[in-house]
């Protein structure tokens, strides 16, 4: 349903209320609220897809769209690329002699809670979320989800900000709780080809690894393929970051 259509529906409903003097019920307001929320959630994607907006959206992939992805197939792929190399980490003077210098903090931050409706070039509002304690983070997980697929690529401005502060960034590979096990099975069935493409995407967009959020119940074979995929990725790119969460 397109945004303009939604607006027309709302206008027609309100006109009927005014003309006939019908007192709206609670269910009416619930329906109206749902329509408005749908419009707000999808308006950026719809406008971009319709060619009525020039606002590009951050990349996300299913296993099929990942395997068929090429930078040349996406005219807007440049807008999500990081242009800032990972800076050397600056270590200040010791404040606490008892602090462990080997301690690490991986921040799983809800960077863009609506990745599918987020401008890949940053936001136009001062109320946008800005992460402000890079000095404490050893690594940063671009924690987000997408209706367009399980692989969510960090938008360039977050990677640039992290790299400026010497913090590497991971994209998210998300298999949700209670999800369909066939999604994971398909993802890792040809795990070498998928892993090669994940690495290609990572290198093109300029981030530093992936965080696997694996909450979907799978069988022994699929679990083994997941493990083999990660081992293969480490073999191909020994310095890439890989995080794992399993519930």
Predicted segments with their positions:
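Chitinase-like catalytic core of GlcNAc-active glycosidases
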Residues: 98-247
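Generic short amphipathic/hydrophobic targeting helices enriched at N-termini
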Residues: 5, 13, 31-32
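A generic local structural motif
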Residues: 4, 16-17, 126-128
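Positively charged n-region of N-terminal signal peptides that target proteins for export
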Residues: 1-8
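N-terminal module-boundary/linker segments of secreted carbohydrate-active enzymes
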Residues: 38-123, 130
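Sec-dependent signal peptide cleavage junction
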Residues: 20-41
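Sec-dependent N-terminal signal peptides of Gram-positive bacterial secreted proteins and lipoproteins
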Residues: 8-26
